[in-house]
């Protein structure tokens, strides 16, 4: 289950992973997209599914842990109804601006945003989406104000900046690399400790003169229904780990115990 539209980064990762799991296990893994409500619709579907190892959720782990802070009437309780399996990929976020935005680099972008005093329009994948929270973090760290424009997913948000409707946004590397040569956007910085192989000409936010923590990273992860036995979760994690080693992307998995601690810590810090 992918609670995002087709063509988004978690969808692409899930489909790549599914191909390798099909080969490794001989079982057919079907990718189902149920986007909406900042991943709540698809997440609820898995929260209520049978815990027999046949249903998994590929989701931004921040959405799981921060949605309870943003929405008071969630149809599930993630601590009880979902069980962390493993991370699939840590994803760097890149700051994009429309090509004609009057700033040639990150420092000028911040200066322009301060001068605009809230009139810089920032597109996001929706209320509470990691791109919304990420731009909020950037605003706090750099002391600027933005006008946030939520869209129903990353596809319309990306189309908006390509069409000049918004000034800036955060995206993952796959989306950034798809559009960087089109002449309609520019990539100013990446939230990473070092430059990435995907876009080596893009400086880190610290290299670009910003605060080191201004642009966060995110993690796409697998969850199982909360009733899934621990030994089944461990078996799934081992198969996923083996499948990930065959992918060409730089991915890192985390064992279920430490991943559970990670998700819990994110929620605690959010509170």
Task: Give names to the regions the model predicted.
Residues 34-42, 91, 126-127, 149-159, ...:
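Short helix-initiation/N-cap motifs at beta->coil->alpha
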Residues 1-5, 29-30, 55-58, 83, ...:
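Short, well-ordered beta-strand elements
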Residues 62-73, 137-141, 168-202:
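A ligand-binding cleft/hinge motif common to bilobed small-molecule-binding domains
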Residues 104, 176-250, 254-257, 265-271:
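C-terminal lobe and pocket-closing loops
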Residues 21, 48-54, 69-156, 168, ...:
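Hinge/capping helix and adjacent helix->loop/strand transition within the periplasmic-binding protein
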Residues 1-14, 36-38, 123-130:
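Extracytoplasmic "Venus flytrap"
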Residues 7-26, 132-140, 179, 241:
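Short, polar/charged alpha-helical segment
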Residues 7, 46-47, 135, 161-162, ...:
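Hydrophobic residues within well-ordered alpha-helices
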